């Protein structure tokens, strides 16, 4: 269900206590787990973007924990959730791993709710050994998730043209490796009440050596979360520009700024917002 359970409360209270008592930067707290721990990282971590800057699930043993805690399969219940912006989420799973069942629902929910996701897969089964998995999908460590800070805004990339086709639920025998959002990067520039700027770009083949073909350009929808000072309300009219392109976005009921069909390349361009 969606109500907080005693075990989750103990985990969060313990993390808070350690952070407070051991001089830990509260903006650089991360959560990761393998197998059952990966399921827990998703189920506990996604709800607590106020605690965790980013989370990483290695071959999670099921997505049901996250599904229930985030009400991914029950839109009605999800409307009543009042959660902070989620942590940036990394996940890698093997389509030939029985525990990976349901990742199509997980990916669709993350995409539909404009939650940040870097997702990698391949025919590596339930392995949690990086050396072994890298032989199947060499992208799993390509994003520096431990450099994410909780006190910095981030872009959410959805519906990208460069995403691989998911093998879930109907093509699990396909051994092809794949990725979602693996090549997108950003750099924060400014974040004030009236002005927000963020540089968006794709990593290039010169910067990342991989067996995957990195496209020269891609089209993607971009939403903004964890803005530190600028707030949006339903019905707000927000002017934006991205390189030579500009437009106006009306904020919807989710109170999230989204601009669709931006063209990204390895050349950084600045997304600017003015209120």
Where are these regions (language model features)?
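Residues that flank catalytic or metal-binding motifs in active/ligand-binding sites
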Residues: 51, 85-87, 218, 236
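Surface-exposed acidic, glycine-flexible loop patches that form ligand/cofactor-binding
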Residues: 18-25, 75-84, 229-231
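Gly/Ser-rich "nucleophile elbow"/oxyanion-hole loop immediately N-terminal to the catalytic nucleophile
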Residues: 1-36, 46, 51
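Extracellular low-complexity, Gly/Ser/Thr-rich intrinsically disordered linkers
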Residues: 2-13, 99-115, 235-246
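A generic secondary-structure signal for well-formed alpha-helical elements
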Residues: 22, 48, 52, 59, ...
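Hydrolase active-site cap/lid region
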Residues: 31-34, 39-85
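The feature captures the conserved acid-bearing segment of alpha/beta-hydrolase catalytic domains
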Residues: 61-151
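Alpha/beta-hydrolase-fold serine-hydrolase catalytic core, especially in secreted/extracellular enzymes
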Residues: 113-118, 124-274
């Amino acid at each position: 269900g969606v109500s907080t359970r005693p075990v989750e409360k103990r985990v969060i209270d313990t993390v808070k206590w350690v952070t407070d008592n051991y001089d830990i930067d509260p903006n650089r707290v991360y959560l990761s787990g393998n197998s059952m721990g990966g399921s827990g990282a998703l189920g506990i971590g996604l709800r607590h973007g106020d605690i965790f800057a980013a989370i990483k699930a290695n071959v999670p043993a099921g997505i049901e924990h996250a599904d229930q805690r985030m009400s991914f399969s029950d839109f009605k219940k999800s409307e009543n959730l009042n959660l902070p912006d989620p942590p940036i989420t990394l996940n890698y799973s093997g389509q030939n791993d029985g525990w990976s069942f349901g990742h199509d629902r997980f990916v669709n929910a993350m995409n539909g709710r404009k939650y940040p996701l870097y997702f990698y897969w391949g025919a590596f089964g339930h392995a949690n050994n990086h050396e072994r998995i890298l032989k199947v999908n060499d992208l799993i460590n390509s994003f520096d998730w431990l450099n994410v800070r909780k006190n910095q805004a981030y872009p959410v990339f959805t519906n990208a043209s460069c995403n691989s086709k998911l093998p879930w639920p109907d093509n699990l025998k396909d051994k092809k490796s794949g990725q979602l959002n693996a090549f997108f990067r950003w750099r924060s520039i400014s974040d004030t009440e009236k002005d927000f700027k963020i540089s968006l770009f794709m990593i290039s083949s010169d910067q990342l050596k991989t067996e995957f073909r990195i496209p020269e350009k891609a089209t993607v929808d971009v939403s903004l979360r964890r803005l530190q000072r600028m707030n949006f309300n339903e019905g707000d009219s927000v002017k934006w520009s991205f390189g030579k392109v500009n437009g106006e976005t009306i904020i919807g009921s989710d109170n999230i700024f989204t601009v669709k069909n931006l063209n990204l390349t390895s050349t950084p361009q600045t997304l600017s917002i003015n209120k």
